[in-house]
Swiss-Prot record:
PROSITE patterns: RNA_POL_BETA (PS01166)
E.C. number: 2.7.7.6
Subunit structure: The RNAP catalytic core consists of 2 alpha, 1 beta, 1 beta' and 1 omega subunit. When a sigma factor is associated with the core the holoenzyme is formed, which can initiate transcription.
Origin: domain of life: Bacteria
UniProt source species: Sinorhizobium medicae (strain WSM419)
Protein name from the UniProt record: DNA-directed RNA polymerase subunit beta
GO biological process, one term: DNA-templated transcription
Upper lineage: Bacteria, Pseudomonadati, Pseudomonadota, Alphaproteobacteria, Hyphomicrobiales
Length: 1380
């Protein structure tokens, strides 16, 4: 095969251990956020054709707004967004919100109302564009920038609207009887509960208020007693037959009962069944076949039945008995004497059909619709006298008014499914039929038919994403606005106003601002590393407004449910009080239009697995049999086994292969992104896997990122989708590269309206939300040819486009002098020396110069009483230089504040009067470095208010910025020129010119030589004979001029933004931000972890020569305690160690061959070795087709260690690990002989040594260590504050007091409780004594004692502290005899 392919070295090549082919493409990982918000804004939809959802639906639901008299109406026409004022980067730097102005077209219609007829005619129509505030936009990475910080709106899980049937699990009543209840939950509006009580009466509640009988609710809907009974029961007709009765034979009702007396055929009079015999279905069927129509009944059989209809005298209208009344010895003669010989009775046998509704009707005091409506009115508005109109209006508004009650499309779909209705999902209010269906189903449940709902099933919980949350919030804002508009429409002269005058957009804008600023679901983005960003955007929270609270959430809600499979990760959730309430979306899951989470499955057609993928929600999936992704298949795609393990209706079972309808698409579809990054997840205990996936999110980006030897194949996906690594937007050729930007000349997607140049600005040493460092590095070189989607730059924690959260470290599992006791970690000094775990952290300090009452503060170098030494890092403007090394206490920005005039003595006044004004007092309020922070200043930004004169520093920063913009413009212009002129030459060449620049002989055929005699700018003067070609040239010229002017315009806009002043908070004249970067090497006290929940704290860093070493002299980097493995059951780390060891061994082998090739050997052995490792398997590289140069590149990349991917649940098994160790020429045990670095002797037994991927977590000892001498005190108790942030002290708590008491250290204890804490006078005395060099002091009364006395007084106890004098003997004061 010809060696034609080349390998560019810009991606990491992995040996892939997965055996199951991936059928479905993994959806973009932040699709949840982007799709939802796009659907809400619908920016790209044409204005006329927007569907009624999102923002459009909000406007449609609030408008039109009519005034109270109906004389005018404000209609909504359409909305559009203008371009945002600042782009994302500018908003980040200036602390602004990235948003676009929303313009809404409104139409005001004024009517003429005829006073006599009341007919309306249109008098005037005005249309106008109205500004309705700014709407925040989402960045490409799925975040929002609010006041300069990146925020994420977390999706919320809540109970789906619809109807739910449940029971109390026998808790309410002592007998343990199940009380059933149904609840109709709308998206917004009143809840309706229908429930049984212990006496089997059915009640309804509205909004959890007082109960009313359900029959009252039905009466309010316009039904009467007879109609209610008719709806819920069937009836039988008893006909008088001589002395007895004739009753129809109903086999279904008699099934399973015993015949109490002989059953006699009413027509023939013969006994068909003898008394005491059981009525089996077979016997009943035989009777039916014989033609049995009716049975004989006696009066006794009739007693205890209930009338199905009113018994009425048709002539007089007198009602003898009502429907539902019981027939007994007293009532039967009444019916007979009135001359009725047919009695309809309800089919209630108290076994299959209970008399619940009839009993409720009997117990209900309300007789008619009016009573029922009044009753409901009294429940909803206690204390108000009801009238028929008000009661009817209120009842209609509760469930039947679309303004107040909205089931939403989801709610309607769920109701249809549960109640077997078929109502279009545009009907969003309740109907009478819905309420009847709910009551019917509830009664059936009580009769033992049907199942209750499981509220933790994902079919009954749905996700509200950004778009929907925002929609609800904006609707609230518009409703607030609506009230104001109505009032204004009524109060002003409507003929003269425009829509603009009616509208005050503040409430709408405030609602948006409030949502992004202070909602529980709007969170500060977790930006420690790319993985934590992605996980944050894919998080699902059950908390938040309208959700659960931590305290109320029980065990069931938090638990893993069978429907979570493939939708929500069972592993990744926080430890602690939020466990199970905050979840993560599974890798392949997506949210459908109704808000239910869907998971993909492969279809099975005629017993063969196809590549067709369908997405199903939990409700739809329940009816299928779903096989696992790792089921064994034959060549033709049918199942090998006769019985297949599958999931059906939440159970795992074995089913015949013909019954299987679907199959999972991938083994990793059940876990989240973070869990899918853990190799050998299948060998770890679930609790440790949870810690592992949570700790990967806390890994600090290191100075030199390194992709793991043992990965899972998810790494490139995370790096790409998180936006950390930059992918090319379209194919092209790299034109320029430096550390800060990449310029690419596009060769595909060339659109004349867009620029043909892509400029990618790289982020250099920017601060993330968590103070880690965001830095991007280019991977391409000039001239590289790129395809769309190629990675062109690495970001934080990425390495060649792979996620790289930590480093591969050589680990030995063995104890070492007790330094790895209790999960401690022992490190080699090499790790510090080679900056293996060094990270950069950036702190931001900001200082504002305000305008105070006494005059403006000033940022200056001229600070009173400060030595020149302290000012050495400041420039003439008083701001620190970039590159200055700063320490605690150093001045970053010099600032002085005017101080109030101190009162003057007469002498001073005299001197003032003679010598003129002395400069007013100022005090030094400079910003200094806080204690414990060292670093280098990496960036300074100066912001000035409009109209405030800029200082030197601000001007210099501005000049740099403009130069940078000019360079971008010039480069883009140069590429544009090059492209256009190259195309122009192609168009001109070979044509005969009829005109040209000065001195050109017309009629000459144009060639490259002829054209190049003239300067480029004159080439446009050539005119050629071919008119079509000449037309194309003209068009090119037009395009070129347009592009040029567009480029210039863009540049001018940007410059204008740089030069104009900044928006500042009120009273602020100037603001300076200083960014200080610090390199943090690893040190004892830092927390480290592997990917399997194996965490520990660095206990000691040992000199390299003292660390244990291998036979070839290599010292290990890390020593871990072997006891950390067995009890924790995270065996994955051991498999990773062995496999990592094999990878490194293989790398060494390849490295040796590469050196041999460079020394002149043949390349074939190297090619074969690489092919045997990476070329095999389903996703192998086409090594045989690579040219020699590519092979060398590959060998260089794999020299430190071959990278492999072992996907979760489908990865390498023990045999694969052994095979790989053998290939690398290592022992299959994975153990090695180790020598003690201090004595040089071998250790007693073989030790497991290998490579583990270790992470440094964002719990650094530098951020935690803290010391205080004097500092702030609490206002009330006068005790020192607590915590590092407040510069607080250490709490000397109850147990510590016991310890001192146990030692009998009375004086130490007294100091602790008084002068070292809250004895104010004593503190001062001690300080004075120390200053004097004296060591005597006296302890007084602690302030907290005074607080206690005050508390007791507030309870009405008169408590006073009496000082009894010390008597002559010198005995101590008596205890105060205080309580009177």
């Amino acid at each position: 095969m010809a060696q034609t392919l080349s390998f560019n070295g810009r991606r990491r090549v992995r040996k892939f251990f997965g055996k199951i082919p991936e059928v479905a493409e993994m959806p973009n990982l932040i699709e949840v956020q982007k799709a939802s918000y796009d659907q809400f804004l619908m920016v790209d939809e044409p204005q006329g054709g927007r569907p009624d959802e999102g923002l459009q639906a909000v406007f449609k639901s609030v408008f039109p707004i009519k005034d109270f008299s109906g004389a005018s109406m404000l209609e909504f026409v359409s909305y559009e967004f203008e371009a945002p004022k600042f782009d994302v980067e500018e908003c980040r730097q200036r602390d602004l919100t990235y948003a676009a102005p929303l313009k809404v077209t409104l139409r005001l219609i004024v009517f003429d109302i005829d006073e006599d007829t009341g007919a309306k005619s249109i008098k005037d129509i005005k249309e106008q564009n109205v500004y309705m505030g700014d709407m925040p936009l989402m960045t490409d990475n799925g975040t929002f920038i609010v006041n300069g910080t990146e925020r994420v709106i977390v999706s919320q899980m809540h109970r789906s609207p619809g109807v739910f049937f449940d029971h109390d699990k026998g808790k309410s009543h002592s007998s343990g009887k199940l009380l059933f209840a149904a609840r109709v939950i709308p998206y917004r509006g009143s809840w309706l509960d229908i429930e049984f009580d212990a006496k089997d009466i059915v009640h309804a509640r509205i909004d959890r208020r007082r109960k009313i009988p359900v029959t009252s609710l039905l009466m309010a809907l316009g039904m009467d007693g007879e109609e209610i009974l008719d709806t819920f029961y069937t009836k039988s007709l008893y006909q008088r037959d001589g002395e007895g009765w004739r009753v129809p034979f109903q086999p279904d009702a008699l099934k399973g009962q015993k015949a109490l007396a002989d059953l006699i055929d009413a027509d023939t009079g013969e006994v068909v069944v003898e008394g005491g015999k059981k009525l089996t279905p077979r016997l009943l069927r035989q009777l039916q076949d014989k033609g049995l129509k009716a049975l004989k009944a006696t009066d006794d059989d009739l007693y205890g039945n209930y009338l199905a209809e009113d018994v009425v005298n048709f002539e007089t209208g007198e009602i003898y008995l009502e429907a539902g009344d019981e027939i007994d010895e007293k009532t039967l003669p009444v019916i007979l004497s009135a001359g009725f010989d047919e009695i309809p009775v309800l089919d209630i046998d108290h076994i299959n059909i209970g008399a619940y509704i009839r009993n409720t009707l009997a117990a209900d005091k309300n007789e008619n619709r009016q009573d029922a409506l009044f009753d409901i009115y009294r429940v909803m508005r206690p204390g108000e006298p009801p009238t028929m109109d008000s009661a009817e209006a209120m009842f209609n508004a509760l469930f039947f008014d679309a303004e107040r009650y909205d089931l939403s499309a989801v709610g309607r779909v769920k109701m249809n499914m549960r109640l077997d209705l078929d109502v279009p999902d545009t009907v969003r209010t309740l109907r009478k039929e819905d309420i009847l269906a709910v009551v019917k189903m509830l009664v059936e449940l009580r009769d033992g038919k049907g199942e209750i709902d499981d509220i933790d099933n994902l079919g009954n919980r749905r996700v509200r994403s950004v778009g929907e949350l925002m929609e609800n919030q904006y609707r609230l804002g518009l409703l607030r606005m609506e009230r104001a508009i109505k009032e204004r429409m009524s109060s002003i002269e409507i003929d003269t106003v425009m829509p603009q005058d009616l509208i005050n957009a503040k409430p709408a804008a405030a609602a948006v601002r409030e949502f992004f600023g202070s909602s529980q679901l709007s969170q500060f983005m977790d930006q420690v590393n790319p993985l934590s960003e992605i996980t944050h955007k894919r998080r699902l929270s059950a908390l938040g407004p309208g959700g659960l609270t931590r305290e109320r959430a029980g065990f069931e809600v938090r638990d893993v449910h069978p429907t979570h499979y493939g939708r929500i990760c069972p592993i990744e959730t926080p430890e602690g009080p939020n466990i199970g309430l905050i979840n993560s979306l599974a890798t392949f899951a997506r949210v459908n239009k109704y808000g239910f989470i869907e998971s993909p499955y492969r279809k099975i057609v005629d017993g063969k697995v196809t590549s067709d993928v369908v997405y199903l929600s939990a409700m739809e999936e329940a009816k299928y049999h779903v096989a696992q992704a790792n089921s064994v298949l034959d060549e033709d795609g049918s199942f090998s086994e006769e019985f297949v393990v599958c999931r059906h209706a939440g159970e795992v079972m074995l089913a015949p292969r013909d019954n299987i309808n679907l199959m999972d698409v991938s083994p990793k579809q059940l876990v989240s992104v973070a869990a899918a990054l853990i190799p050998f997840l299948e060998n770890d205990d679930a609790n440790r896997a949870l810690m592992g996936s949570n700790m990967q999110r806390q890994a600090v980006p290191l100075l030199r990122a390194e992709a793991p030897f043992v990965g899972t194949g998810m790494e490139p996906v995370v790096a790409r989708d998180s936006g950390a690594a930059i992918a090319a937007r379209r194919g092209g050729i790299v034109d320029q590269v430096d550390a800060t930007r990449i310029v690419i000349r596009a060769t595909e997607d060339l659109d004349p309206s867009k620029s043909g140049v892509d400029i990618y600005r790289l982020q250099k040493f920017q601060r993330s939300n968590q103070n880690t460092c965001v830095n991007q590095r280019p991977l391409v070189t000039v001239g590289d040819v790129l395809n769309k989607g190629d990675i062109i730059a690495d970001g934080p924690s990425t390495d060649l486009g792979d996620l790289a959260l930590g480093r591969n470290a050589l680990v030995a599992f063995m104890p070492w002098n007790g330094y790895n006791y209790e999960d401690s970690i022992l490190l080699s000094e090499r790790i510090v020396r080679d900056d293996v775990f060094t990270s950069i952290h950036i702190e931001e300090f900001e200082v504002m110069a305000r305008d105070t009452k006494l005059g403006p503060e000033e940022i200056t170098r001229d600070i009173p009483n400060v030595s020149e030494e302290a000012l050495k890092n400041l420039d003439e403007a008083g701001i620190v230089y970039i590159g200055a090394e700063v320490q605690p206490g150093d001045i970053l920005v010099g600032k002085i504040t005017p101080k109030g005039e101190s009162p003057m003595t007469p002498e001073e006044k005299l001197l003032r009067a003679i010598f003129g004004e002395k400069a007013s007092d100022v005090r030094d309020t400079s910003m200094r470095m806080p204690p414990g922070t060292f670093g280098t200043v990496v960036e300074v930004r100066v912001f000035n208010r409009h109209g405030v004169e800029k200082d030197e520093r601000a001007m210099a920063i501005e000049r740099e910025e403009i130069e940078r913009l000019a360079k971008d413009r010039d480069d883009e212009q140069a590429i544009l020129d090059r492209n256009v002129y190259a195309r122009l030459v192609d168009m001109l060449r070979g044509h005969v010119a009829v005109a040209g620049p000065k001195g050109f002989k017309k009629g000459t055929e144009l060639s490259n030589a002829v054209i190049s005699e003239y300067p480029r700018s004159q080439w446009w003067m050539f005119a050629i004979e071919d008119e079509k070609a000449q037309g194309e040239i003209e068009a090119l010229r037009g395009q070129y001029d347009e592009s040029k002017s567009r480029l210039e315009q863009r540049f001018m806009d940007k410059v204008e933004k740089v030069q104009r002043g900044d928006e500042m908070p009120p009273g602020v004249m100037k603001m300076v931000k200083v960014f200080v970067a610090v390199k943090r090497k690893i040190q004892p006290g830092d927390k480290m972890a592997g990917r399997h929940g194996n965490k520990g704290v660095v206990s000691r860093i040992v000199p390299i020569e003292d660390m244990p070493f291998l036979e070839d002299g290599t010292h290990v980097d890390v020593v871990l305690n072997p006891l950390g493995v067995p009890s924790r059951m995270n065996v994955g780390q051991i498999l990773e160690t062995h496999l990592g060891w094999a990878c490194a061994g293989m790398g060494k082998k390849i490295g040796a061959m590469l050196d041999a090739y460079k020394a002149g050997a043949d390349i074939q052995p190297l090619r074969d070795t690489i092919d045997s490792v990476i070329g095999s398997g389903p996703k192998g590289e086409p090594i045989k087709q690579y040219d020699d140069e590519s092979i060398v590149r590959l060998a260089e990349q794999t020299r430190r260690g071959v990278s492999i991917a072992t996907p979760v649940f489908d990865g390498a098994v023990e045999a694969d690990v052994n095979e790989m160790l053998e290939q690398a020429g290592l022992k299959v045990t994975g153990q090695s002989t180790l020598y003690d670095g201090r004595t040089g002797e071998t250790f007693d037994r073989q030790v497991t040594v290998g490579y583990i991927y270790m992470l440094k977590l964002n719990h650094l000892v530098d951020d935690k260590i803290h010391a205080r001498s004097i500092g702030p005190y609490s206002l009330v108790t006068q005790q020192p504050l607590g915590g590092k942030a407040q510069f607080g002290g250490q709490r000397f708590g109850e147990m510590e007091v016991w310890a001192l008491e146990a030692y009998g250290a009375a004086y130490t204890l007294q100091e602790m409780l008084t002068v070292k804490s809250d004895d104010v006078a004593g503190r001062t005395k001690v300080y004075e004594a120390i200053v004097r060099g004296d060591d005597t002091f006296e302890a007084g009364i602690p302030e907290s004692f005074n607080v206690l006395v005050k508390e007791m007084r507030s309870l009405g106890l008169s408590v006073e502290l009496e000082n009894s004098k010390v008597d002559e003997v010198g005995a101590s004061a008596q205890l105060p005899d205080a309580a009177e």
